[in-house]
Regions:
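Non-catalytic, soluble scaffold/interaction modules
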Residues: 1-169
């Protein structure tokens, strides 16, 4: 909540439908390829967003995306997801179960900084899941007129994309 008054059009953030069925699969290798493609698309997308954030907003906001890129490049997390795929689960299920495990682990920590990393994992896994499902997620960098954001929740990456030139509240 911000103090003051802002007048602009409402930009209602509607969460994309990222629901899926938990499915057992038989073609493990093609499922791993799907996962790696989703990771690759997410990486390219985050590199572009990071570079734009760097140019428009500076190092601090770009650092959020650099952290997300590190998560995407974490061989331990990717390996844990691939183990679940090898156990016969579809990539979506493997991703969500692995992300949930990491999120719960970070949220249980005593260190506030580490607890905040749970939001980063949630954000990155949502991006990868959107690519697995072929669903577009919101991109605030495309806003080019004055707006007031109306949303239940904003992820770290969405918040970092907010351009105060156009976002009035």
């Amino acid at each position: 909540v911000s103090s003051g008054i802002a007048i602009a059009k409402a930009y209602c953030l509607i969460e994309p439908d990222l629901s899926f069925e938990k499915v057992k699969i038989t073609d493990i290798e093609s499922e791993k390829v799907r996962l790696k493609e989703a990771f690759k698309k997410s990486t390219l997308e985050l590199e572009e967003i990071r570079d734009t954030a760097q140019t428009k907003f500076g190092d601090e906001k770009a650092a959020i995306f650099s952290a997300h890129l590190l998560l995407l490049g974490d061989p331990e997390m990717l390996g844990a997801i691939e183990v679940k795929i090898s156990d016969g689960w579809n990539a979506e299920t493997a991703l969500q179960e692995t992300a949930t495990m990491y999120i719960e682990m970070f949220e249980a920590m005593d260190n506030d900084y580490m607890k905040e990393r749970a939001a980063d994992i949630r954000d990155v896994s949502t991006r990868v899941l959107s690519h697995l499902l072929g669903v577009e997620i919101p991109d605030f960098s495309r806003i080019s007129t004055d707006v007031i954001i109306v949303a239940e929740d904003l992820t770290p990456s969405l918040t970092a994309q907010l351009d105060k030139t156009y976002v009035k509240g």
